[in-house]
Amino acid sequence: MKRLLFFLICVFFSKTSYSNVDISINKGIDISTPIGISSFEWVEVNENNNYENISKIISCDLQNSGKFSPIEIYKESNKSIEKQIKNNSINLNKLNINTILTGKISLNYNGEYLISYKLIDLVNYPGKILLSGYRTVHLQSFRKVAHEISNEIFKKLTGIQGVFHTRIAYILYNKNNEYKYKLCISDYDGYNQNIIHQSNMPLMSPSWSPDGKKIAYVTFEKGSSEIKIKDIKTGSIKHISSFPYHNGAPAFSPNGENLAFALSKTGSLNLYVMNLKNGYIKQITHGNSNNTEPSWFPDNNSLAYTSDQSGTPQIYKINISNGKFNRLSWLGSKNQNANVSPDGKFIAMVNSEKKSQHIALFDINMDNAKIITETFLDEAPSISPNNVMIIYTSSYGDSSVIELISTNGRFKTSILKINGQIKFPAWSQKI
């Protein structure tokens, strides 16, 4: 069994090495609410060519959500845009937008930058300021500030909390490096990448703690699989599980009190839950079928998981208190790797049919599913903490990509591209 598991892992990562990360934005596939984003105006100071373009970052954030279609307003328009609104002389039909964001950047006496911004209504109450604010920051914090402004705009216009400041985790593989496997975290859009752990042996399945301070993962550094939890800030590592055969698929409960995972110590893969305070482990599933890939529902008492008890992999739901379970997925021949949305209303999963493998969404209340991706060999969906976006991996020849798609299907983009393997993306759930 050890040899088989190691073979499967090698196949999973059996592509060429990766190079520098590339960030790219692709065209949307539907119409969203238009919003004007003007270039931030530099006031009484020459524009710093090394700064992060705040308006561009905000545009990308809002577009990634699938709820907005940003329209760039260039500098020559920006200088007079507020005056035109005030004088009611702006051509609304030409701009075709409901709101517009304007901003200014100036340098204060201690060398910090003052960034001010306004979100202005152009339709209901033309000229009314819907949102305004300012930040005093150093140059290296421009990207962070841009994400914060995006969050404010998104919340103001949709009523939904923005998550553009959140982070993702993933595994990189490069067979030519000293350390072939790297557990990394970055901003949700792929920027500011940091290596959290690296090894010559496989690393798999990162899972964030709800507070965003720790990551559970699977390692083979001692020759067989183990589950560990690493504190991101201190670097301390806590051992969780190293039973015979396979230890895998860790998943923190939403309240952070328990960790679900899969063990094959009795022969078949079954689900277990550990109380992280006292270390007590409870077996959840039983029998000869393979049960793995747990994902928590927000009630902290139910899990979605993959089981082959019907003959092919399908998604099931189980109550961890009484053991009652039922099948959820019926789309096509195979469904696996479920990720339950934070609000518990839908599940993202991998659907396989003949030679295709795509991400599908299963609406729990409506009891129906639909395929939302068209990329190649789509895997490992992870839903944003506000239920608006999904990241997943796909393959393009020898390259591996983290894709982002809005749950409404209106926009998709590639956020991380490498010439090699990138696997197991996981979106932090801390807002």
UniProtKB/Swiss-Prot annotation:
InterPro entries: 6-blade_b-propeller_TolB-like (IPR011042), PD40 (IPR011659), Tol-Pal_TolB (IPR014167), TolB_N (IPR007195). Keywords: Cell cycle, Cell division, Periplasm, Signal. Residues 1-19 form the signal peptide. The keyword Cell division applies. GO terms for cellular component: periplasmic space. Pfam families: PD40 (PF07676), TolB_N (PF04052). GO terms for biological process: cell division; protein import. The keyword Protein biosynthesis does not apply. It is found in: Periplasm. The Tol-Pal system is composed of five core proteins: the inner membrane proteins TolA, TolQ and TolR, the periplasmic protein TolB and the outer membrane protein Pal. They form a network linking the inner and outer membranes and the peptidoglycan layer. HAMAP family: TolB. Part of the Tol-Pal system, which plays a role in outer membrane invagination during cell division and is important for maintaining outer membrane integrity. TolB occupies a key intermediary position in the Tol-Pal system because it communicates directly with both membrane-embedded components, Pal in the outer membrane and TolA in the inner membrane. Belongs to the TolB family. This is Tol-Pal system protein TolB.
